[in-house]
Amino acid sequence: MKAGFVGVGAMGAAMAGHVQAKGQGEVFAYDVRREAVDALADQGIKPVDTLADITRAADVIVVIVVDDQQVLDVTEALSVDGVEGTLIAVAATVHPDTMRKAAEIAAAKGLRVIDAPVCFGLYGAKEGQLASLCGGSAEDIEDARPVLDCYSRAVHHIGPLGCGQIAKTVNNMLHWANCVANYEALLIAKRFGIDAQKLREVLLQCPARNGTLADWDSTRFTWPIKDMDIALALAREGELTLPLYGQVDHLVQTLTPDGVKGLLYGDAAPYLGRTVTAKDEGGHGG
């Protein structure tokens, strides 16, 4: 099976590398940044110059681009000269409606689409330990599985088209809420003179443990705005009132990797315009 990747930034490049190393066929790559594609040549991944080239070369095409409009634009371009039966697996995180629009565009030319967004971020991509949350027909997902398996610890079929994106959004909601909850809770520890990193290690053996806390050092806080926009849009469409997530949407945007490092390993941590230190080291500052 020949695989193609559209979008070979840090995530896409790592995923393509695993498919090349573990797969059973050629791997092709396209990116608007030619240098990103050329950087993969020493792994045996073949560069292509246009989206038309990749749609003619690959049986399964993994799309991991930035946003909804890019997914639609890429699907449109892939479909123009696409080979009937070619399967597009959207690994980007987008709104479920975007998946349905993409599927309509592709179906008009005989191409197939599934949603296959991934969890565990850049670390999971580098280690080949992502979780693929898939929406689409069982047949299409099984056809994509030989490619998805190469970079995934597990491939889950959640339901019809769009359900993978909903599942990814639910995961993101819990992840970002945990980021805020972990930060605020450990601020209490720091304020009262407890080593936050040592307490984190203890909490990972207690009922309060969560996956976000375990991997907190690697959280990059790259996409909270996009992720929460999708979550709150789904809440509105579902006529749901979710007051907690209105607060999470605001608070998670104040967190940074440096702030987490300061909280866990430093003498002070920033939060909401203040600098929090232990009481016996001068109070909360700010």
Feature map (PLM): residue ranges:
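Rossmann-fold NAD(P) dinucleotide-binding segment
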Residues: 51-112
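NAD(P)+-binding Rossmann beta1-loop-alpha1 motif at the extreme N-terminus of oxidoreductases
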Residues: 1-63
